[in-house]
Amino acid sequence: MRSINSIYNIETMHLVSTLVFLLMGLLSLHAEKPNILLICVDDLRPELNCFGVDYIHSPNIDRLAASGRAFHNHYVNAPTCGASRYSLLTGDYYPGAKNHALFDRAKQLNEGGILRPSLPAWFRQHGYTTISIGKVSHHPGGLGGKDWDDPSIVEMPNSWDISLQPVGDWQHPRGVMHALAEGKIWGSGEILSVFEAFDGDDQSYPDGLIAETAIKQIKKLDASGSPFFMAVGFIRPHLPFGAPKKYLDLYADCELPTIAHPNKPKHPSSWTNSGEFMRYN
């Protein structure tokens, strides 16, 4: 049986490589305050060639790992999306944190209850231009509201100089989060397939637009001459499992190992009735 996460990480790795190698050429320009690129990939586990998984095609991130330091024992404060991102971006442990944790913090911040800066706010206070593109905090683009595009509801106030989320054919950031090709959006009333292999370019999915936007911003920031902290968040391999067909074709003749534990766990605490996964066709 093929591993879903294995198949769908190759597109994101291709996009990541372009950003990383563009940035590496700029690091020497700001020796005292080097430029910093943080790359977040949603739901990507360490099923990569550089972690010993030899059937995965991940040459670009493998080169990145070989040129730096790869962590083979790494732990996070929380196993869920919003809580883990909260901890990463604030340095705080928030027991019981859910996906709205950063919005909770924003409310406390506005009320004067928090004095510690967030990670990007710290860089901002020390002379960096800070920019967020894609899904860095829980909401792509960092805004709240029905479609995650209300500028009056900011997930991380006083943190980012620029916060961007290209929406393309998907209308709004909420649509981008649950996107399939040709502007299709999970939760819009149409029952969609959880799998999709679309015969198109990288921009057929939001991650292609995110990478394209990030590359343009890096070039613009480099021309400004000031140091920057840029965070770029890719959405795949989060549900739904859609990617350009050219990446899936790399695995056409690949025999992936069977899933180690294919059956439902015995104990209820180990099983979740996913509200996302169960709503696809």
Task: Cite the ranges covered by each PLM segment.
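Sec-dependent N-terminal signal peptides
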Residues: 16-27
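Structural motif marking the loop-to-transmembrane transition
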Residues: 12-16, 33
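N-terminal secretory signal peptides that target proteins for export/translocation
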Residues: 1-13
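Serine/proline-rich low-complexity intrinsically disordered segments, especially terminal tails, linkers
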Residues: 5-8, 19, 30
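Formylglycine-dependent sulfatase
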Residues: 27-281
